[in-house]
Amino acid sequence: VLKRGHKAGNLKILPIIVEDRIQEIKRTKDLVEFFVKIGLAKELERISEVKIRAGKGKMRGRKYKTKIGPLFVVTEDKGIGKAVRNIIGSDVCKVQNLSAEYLAPGAAAGRLTIFTKSAIEKLGVQK
């Protein structure tokens, strides 16, 4: 995760597993507070940088390059989808829709992933 560029240096255990209450967060402000509490403030700063692409991609509708941020894996979306969509580079994925494209975007493994407890349990049952 750190080799991929994520700023999660003070976290000891990865992936991050949180309570199911995180699925009920509906406001981006509350989600940003959650990031700061678990020590991902530098990660938020990293993904907020947007650069202008070099070359002709600007003319073809791909003007900005954005960084890939954390992925939230949940069992059901009770409002967290609306909170996460306002943070550039972050995604929410239900367990049944989880694929390699979410976990390793651009074929680069090691995305910072935040699982809920019920999502981990459901992953174990699916196998």
Language-model region placement:
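Extended polybasic, low-complexity segments that bind anionic RNA or targeting/receptor surfaces
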Residues: V1-K127
